[in-house]
Curated annotation (Swiss-Prot):
The keyword Transcription does not apply. One of its GO terms (biological process) is fatty acid metabolic process. It comes from the Eukaryota. Catalyzes the interconversion of (R)- and (S)-stereoisomers of alpha-methyl-branched-chain fatty acyl-CoA esters. Acts only on coenzyme A thioesters, not on free fatty acids, and accepts as substrates a wide range of alpha-methylacyl-CoAs, including pristanoyl-CoA, trihydroxycoprostanoyl-CoA (an intermediate in bile acid synthesis), and arylpropionic acids like the anti-inflammatory drug ibuprofen (2-(4-isobutylphenyl)propionic acid) but neither 3-methyl-branched nor linear-chain acyl-CoAs. Its EC number is 5.1.99.4. It catalyses: a (2S)-2-methylacyl-CoA = a (2R)-2-methylacyl-CoA; (25R)-3alpha,7alpha,12alpha-trihydroxy-5beta-cholestan-26-oyl-CoA = (25S)-3alpha,7alpha,12alpha-trihydroxy-5beta-cholestan-26-oyl-CoA; (2R,6)-dimethylheptanoyl-CoA = (2S,6)-dimethylheptanoyl-CoA. This is Alpha-methylacyl-CoA racemase. Optimum pH is 6-7. Pfam families: CoA_transf_3. The gene is Amacr.
């Protein structure tokens, strides 16, 4: 796999950090999840392909263990607020002194500087501060968060993964690691570059929910069907819009011009009335295989079984028959081979990991006696 041999230490956190670590593991990296003592499980359920080490970082011997491991690692991924790692004497200056090749990835909400750098937040707060949340929502309604995907996973976990890969690539030239300041506010803002760049064109000149690409246009929104389901319409280009009208049984002559913004509300009512006359399945029979840019709004379960997704193998199942998306993108020579095993229990690989990182049997036994580590396999390995 593409990242075979890359050693990653991921400090336990929520959502974006685990997602970043999972991507790296899916593509072949050796990811060790450094869990807190006493943890019961992994709340983000994104520990696929990782090994778990339970370690008390709040005590100096535990911090010393991590420091020693970082001397042999390629990447450290930490998800804490600004300053936390420095308090533990595990800041980048300290760890990179031992290992100049170490890539120190810092994934936070607000970044390592600025007035918000040490305050708490969640996805909705990061999307709000990026400016993007102001653009999401229906006309006349409050802005609403797009699940917790945009900041946590797009602007956070995925952008941090990109930073790590860039740093790994650059290291092949310089032989040196570097510090990555990945944060969800700036990551989300970067994802919205198109929005910023097209403001001068007037693409977002109307109030929220009344523009071309935010549900304001009658040909770029969703419609309810006769059976209470929904269809998604994205017929922007004139040739696609013509096919949309054909499928709906409408003539362009009986409607205002496609780009007549002032007529969009009435056109939406007209389209809604037509869509409400047939079921989702009936509309699929009409539009599937056409260039009208009309698709069904699928539930997760429906997406799993949709013919297109099944033909491509877009979803996989683990040994417990739980389904999830296959890693993307697909690489032709070195594709991802995600683990089909269950997520590790906390501390399941503590002894194994420490041995791999050069700790002796006696050292491991002492760490356990001092309650610096936990392992549910300790007795079997000592």
């Amino acid at each position: 796999m593409a990242l075979r041999g890359v050693r990653v230490l991921e400090l336990a956190g929520l959502a974006p950090g685990p997602f970043c670590g999972m991507i790296l593991a899916d593509f072949g990296a050796e990811v060790v999840l450094v869990d807190r003592l006493g943890s019961v499980n992994h709340p983000s359920h994104l520990a696929r392909g990782k090994r778990s080490l339970a370690l008390d970082l709040k005590r100096s011997p535990g911090a010393a263990v991590l420091r020693r491991m970082c001397a042999r690692a390629d990447v450290l991924l930490e998800p804490f607020r600004c300053g936390v790692m420095e308090k533990l004497q595990l800041g980048p200056e300290t760890l990179r002194q031992d290992n100049p090749k170490l890539i120190y990835a810092r994934l936070s909400g607000f970044g390592q500087s600025g007035i918000f750098s040490k305050v708490a937040g969640h996805d909705i707060n990061y999307v709000a501060l990026s400016g993007v949340l102001s653009k999401i929502g229906r006309s006349g309604e409050n802005p609403y968060p797009p699940l917790n995907l945009l900041a946590d996973f797009g602007g956070g976990g995925l952008m941090c993964t990109l930073g790590i890969l860039l740093a790994l690539f650059e290291r092949t030239r310089s032989g040196l690691g570097q510090v990555i300041d990945a944060n969800m506010v700036e990551g989300t803002a970067y994802l919205s570059t198109f929005l910023w760049k097209t403001q001068a064109m007037g693409l977002w000149a109307q109030p929220r929910g009344q523009n071309l690409l935010d549900g304001g246009a009658p040909f770029y929104t969703t419609y309810k069907t006769a059976d209470g389901e929904f269809m998604a319409v994205g017929a922007i280009e004139p040739q696609f819009y013509t096919l949309l009208l054909k499928g709906l049984g409408l003539e362009s002559e009986e409607l205002p011009s496609q780009m007549s913004i002032e007529d969009w509300p009435e056109m939406k009512k007209k389209f809604a009335d037509v869509f409400a006359r047939k079921t989702k399945a009936e509309w699929c029979q009409i539009f599937d295989g056409t260039d009208a840019c009309v698709t069904p709004v699928l539930t997760l379960e429906e997406a799993l079984h949709h013919q297109h997704n099944r033909e491509r193998g877009s979803f996989i199942t683990d040994e417990e028959q739980h389904a999830c998306p296959r890693p993307a993108p697909q690489l032709s020579r070195t594709p991802a081979v995600p683990s089909a095993k269950r997520d590790p229990s906390v501390g399941e690989h503590t002894v194994e990991v420490l041995k791999d990182y050069g700790f002796s049997q006696e050292e491991i036994h002492q760490l356990h006696s001092d309650r610096i580590i936990e392992s549910n396999k300790l007795k079997a390995n000592l």
